[in-house]
Amino acid sequence: MTVKDILDAIQSKDATSADFAALQLPESYRAITVHKDETEMFAGLETRDKDPRKSIHLDEVPVPELGPGEALVAVMASSVNYNSVWTSIFEPVSTFAFLERYGKLSPLTKRHDLPYHIIGSDLAGVVLRTGPGVNAWQPGDEVVAHCLSVELESPDGHDDTMLDPEQRIWGFETNFGGLAEIALVKTNQLMPKPKHLTWEEAAAPGLVNSTAYRQLVSRNGAAMKQGDNVLIWGASGGLGSYATQFALAGGANPICVVSSPQKAEICRSMGAEAIIDRNAEGYKFWKDEHTQDPKEWKRFGKRIRELTGGEDIDIVFEHPGRETFGASVYVTRKGGTITTCASTSGYMHEYDNRYLWMSLKRIIGSHFANYREAYEANRLIAKGKIHPTLSKTYSLEETGQAAYDVHRNLHQGKVGVLCLAPEEGLGVRDAEMRAQHIDAINRFRNV
């Protein structure tokens, strides 16, 4: 049995769940990996100069053992997130430390501690096998997966699974990720594939869509409501493009910050009206690497009020971090909220605390999403309320180049990777719904 036999079954219109269950699994499959013996290959280089094309490998690897509550999924398509870039350049730490720690948890998790790491935190594909105790999913189900992996043996995670002490990001802090022909997931990561999308379109939203949903919409994040003024940094990017869509769909007013006229046009195409091109308007929030410029915060706040009819910001959707955080705290209205999920420009934030405490503002840390939040975010995709931001698709062999392009910010929105799917455009099950939303689905294509 080969992966081609699996692909033939997936592409057959007549294959049943029993047919998929009867398929023999191959002994091995192709997967994107990094190697433990190469973690020092970029020592001494600046982050920008570390090249994922040198560290990312396409290897033939054995199919992992299937455990209770797990599934093996034939991966038709995946995508590249920043965590795969971090893994490939071994920053801020090597992910093999995560695998070693996870491997010590139980005899079953020891499978993850290997000299290679199969990466990737998104997938769209078809269930091949389920382990003991699985009732909700069966072979042949077309699925996407979110990337929250939890053990839930502690009481801490039963109010919000993101608080589970053994919470991990699949394909980053665990092995057997989605940039492969077969992936191993927990079945509480699975969600129905949106029927109107292709495999590569369905795979793309996962991590970033769920992250944006929790950070902006969920009660665990900013709990956005109708009429809120929402400042969105990087509003046309992988995270920001979903935040912009959520704000528009939820009746809020997104104030989109971008860095070029092209990116401003993408925001307009999504329906945004209030847009700030920070490069064109010359905002420099730091005089030098040690000193911020409050005058620039004030100029930025004045521009925001011009766009909102004199109102300040209710919610800031933060992820750049050090470069923008002082400005974010300043421009937020009294009693407003700054939510942060990343620090792409630097982890050590500085802000004037007087503008926080004396104005009763809140800073909320937000990290990925729990199963309910991820499911709700995917449900909005499936209903055509939120749309993929896929701009380009690579082959599995080209994953190194895809990661390089993301690392160097040469992309827009999300970039996809075909795994088992032989070409783009496959997997659509609801052509009528697709036709209704085709312009929005293709909004980021070839940008």
UniProtKB/Swiss-Prot annotation:
Regulation: Inhibited by divalent cations (30-100%), beta-chloromercuribenzoate (85%), iodoacetamide (40%) and N-ethylmaleamide (80%). The presence of CoA thioesters containing 12-20 carbon atoms results in inhibition of enzyme activity. The greatest degree of inhibition is observed in the presence of palmitoyl-CoA and myristoyl-CoA. The branched-chain fatty acids, isopalmitoyl-CoA and isomyristoyl-CoA are less effective inhibitors of the crotonyl-CoA reductase. Concentrations of NADPH above 200 uM lead to inhibition of enzyme activity.
Reactions that this protein is recorded to catalyse: butanoyl-CoA + NADP(+) = (2E)-butenoyl-CoA + NADPH + H(+)
One Pfam family it belongs to: ADH_N
Domain of life assignment: Bacteria
Gene3D superfamilies: Medium-chain alcohol dehydrogenases, catalytic domain
Enzyme Commission number: 1.3.1.86
Record keywords, A-Z: Metal-binding, NADP, Oxidoreductase, Zinc
Enzyme class: oxidoreductase
MF term (GO), any: NADP binding
Temperature dependence comment: Optimum temperature is 40 degrees Celsius.
pH profile of the protein: Optimum pH is 6.5.
SMART domains registered for this protein in UniProt: PKS_ER
Function of the protein: May play a role in supplying butyryl-CoA for straight-chain fatty acid biosynthesis. Catalyzes the conversion of crotonyl-CoA to butyryl-CoA. It shows a high substrate specificity for crotonyl-CoA, a short-chain-length (C4), but no measurable activity is observed with shorter (C3) or longer-chain-length enoyl-CoA thioesters.
Assembly and interaction partners: Homodimer.
Family: Belongs to the zinc-containing alcohol dehydrogenase family. Crotonyl-CoA carboxylase/reductase subfamily.
Protein's UniProt name: Crotonyl-CoA reductase
Upper taxonomic lineage: Bacteria, Bacillati, Actinomycetota, Actinomycetes, Kitasatosporales
Gene name tied to this protein: ccr
